[in-house]
Structures are given as C-alpha cells and as structure tokens.
Amino acid sequence: MPKVIRDLPDTSSYWAAVWSVCAMPDVHVICDAPIGCYNLVATAIPDYTDAIPNIDNITPSVITEEEVGGTGTAPAVQRTYDDLVTMKKISDDTKLIVVSTAESEMIGSDLTDLVKMLKPGTTFFHSESLTEDEWVGRDRILRWLWEQYGVDAGSVEPEPGLVNIIGPTYGCFNAPSDLHEVKRLIEGAGGRVNMVFPYESKLADIAQLAKAQYSVVLYKEFG
C-alpha cells in the first residue's frame, strides 16, 4: 500500500508571496484566485498567526467557473483592477502586484501582458504555487522584489555599522518577539538596524537595503 500523506507542514509559494509582499504598506496585491483561496491566506490564518483580523492590501479576482471554463482569468483581474480604481483603493504611490495561484496556474493563466495595460509599473509574479512550498517561495519572492524594484541600489553607498534583517513576514507565530530579540542581539554587538525587510519596510525603499554593511538573513525556524 502506498504511503498516504495525511497532512502537510508547509503552505504553498502563493501564501509565501502574499505574506511577504503584503507586509509592506505601499503595495496592493491582486491575487488571481477564487474567493476561498483569498479568505484563508488573507483573513483566517493571519488572524491566528499574527493577531490581525485581515490583510487590507490584497484583493481577489474571484475567478469562477466562467473563467476556468472559457474566458481565462484576465477579464476577472481587469474587473478587479477597475473596481479598485473606482473605489480609490490604490493611489499613485501604490505598487500594484498581480500574483498567480494554484487555481489560475492550473488553467495556464499568464498575465504578463495584461499587467502592462493596468496601472503603470504593475508587475506579475508567477508564484509557482503548484510546485513550490512556502520556503522556496519566500526566497524567490524576496529575490524577485529586489530584481524588479531595487534598480536604484547601485547609487546607494554602504554605511559602516548598518545591518539589514531580511526575512520576517506575516504567517509566523512569534515574529514580533523573535524580531525584537534579533534586533537586541545586533544592537548589543554594536550594530545599527538599517531595514527589516519586508516586515517593517516599504517597497519604495528597497534600494536602501544596499546601504547596510551586513545582512542577517533569517531561516524558517524564525517565528
């Protein structure tokens, strides 16, 4: 009899993308998802792990049988974007990111071309939710954010004694207390915290990561 996996200890890379990106207040995410896949990652679980009732800066495209069976998800994402503009949920300074989910990936939705017709600067992150777990996903989304938005880093001069803390996101039970302890250790050793990315950062400031002399990169036991 084959071994049956009764439960999984990790979530998917889609969850990793949402928990990483939505920690930054100047970002809004459109998740290309049915309503249930939005509810879990944005309302039910962060209430449990982070004591926040819901993540405000994410909106689902609410894909249904119509999109799955024929039209594809692009019309749903376009409609969601139009609604956000009408309701003034995104400003000129908001960075808009569209993220794929397992459901949209199952039907081959690639919104690379669509995002070019949305708000200027909108990007599409293919989360690889069907094949990657949250730990691979966290690494990949952080690297992707740097590659997409950190282009000005070359003009930033490093400052001695500054230290980045890279890795804290939503979805970790003891994130605030563990982060406080990491900060205390850095400052006790004579360092000064430059940025906590993405947990206490804005995406617009990502190039300032280059200002640090050192970076402390956290691993999955954090939180």
Pin down the residues of each PLM region.
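An N-terminal assembly and electron-transfer interface module characteristic of large anaerobic redox
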Residues: 1-223
